[in-house]
């Protein structure tokens, strides 16, 4: 497509005015709700980590200077992929960022945070979203905790 002269030959077509107005309204709504959402995510991430600490979970990254809707933890001696495979029918978590899920290399972010290469393979990343409920969060905590305990039992029996 080639733009018209009035668009300096860059963009063809008329501007999507309803889309522009809708986007503006979406930004307005998100700005109003952002503070409450951020607070909720911080509380929920804290809840998850407190429970995971009880079963040996270690936080990857800074405890406060972080995105509140992402929690990255590891459980020493338990491969992240083993955890993911064990819970994949019930919950969606990953071993790295969304853009590197198919990459088998250690996470460059975790390496930059000072983790050694071996430990990066134990990491799991849990992302929260606006539509998640407290019931789902409790289910996630219980499922991952039970999985960790089962994997620890299996590895001690080998």
Describe every region a protein language model picked out.
Residues 27-49, 56-67:
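Structural signature of PLP-dependent enzymes
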Residues 71-124:
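Conserved C-terminal alpha-helix-loop-beta "cap" of PLP-dependent enzymes
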Residues 52-53, 87:
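Hydrophobic C-terminal alpha-helix "anchor/cap" residues
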Residues 10, 61-62, 93-96, 127:
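Thr-Gly-centered strand-to-loop micro-motif
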Residues 17-20, 27, 45, 68, ...:
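A general structural signal for well-ordered alpha-helical segments in protein cores
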Residues 60-76, 129:
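A short beta-alpha structural unit
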Residues 1-38:
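Conserved core segment of the aminotransferase class I/II
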Residues 106-158:
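PLP-dependent enzyme catalytic core of the Aspartate aminotransferase-like
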């Amino acid at each position: 497509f080639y733009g018209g002269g009035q668009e300096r030959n860059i963009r063809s077509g008329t501007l999507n005015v309803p889309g522009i107005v809708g986007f503006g309204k979406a930004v307005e709504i998100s700005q109003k709700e952002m503070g409450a959402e951020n607070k909720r995510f911080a509380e929920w991430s804290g809840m998850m980590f407190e429970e995971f600490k009880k079963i040996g979970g270690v936080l990857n990254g800074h405890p406060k200077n972080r995105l509140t809707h992402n929690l990255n933890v590891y459980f020493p001696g338990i491969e992240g992929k083993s955890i993911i495979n064990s819970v994949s029918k019930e919950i969606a978590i990953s071993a790295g960022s969304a853009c590197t899920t198919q990459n088998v290399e250690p996470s460059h972010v975790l390496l930059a945070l000072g983790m050694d290469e071996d430990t990066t393979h134990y990491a799991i990343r849990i992302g929260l979203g606006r539509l998640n409920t407290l019931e789902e969060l409790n289910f996630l905590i219980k499922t991952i905790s039970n999985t960790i305990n089962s994997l620890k039992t299996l590895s001690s029996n080998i």
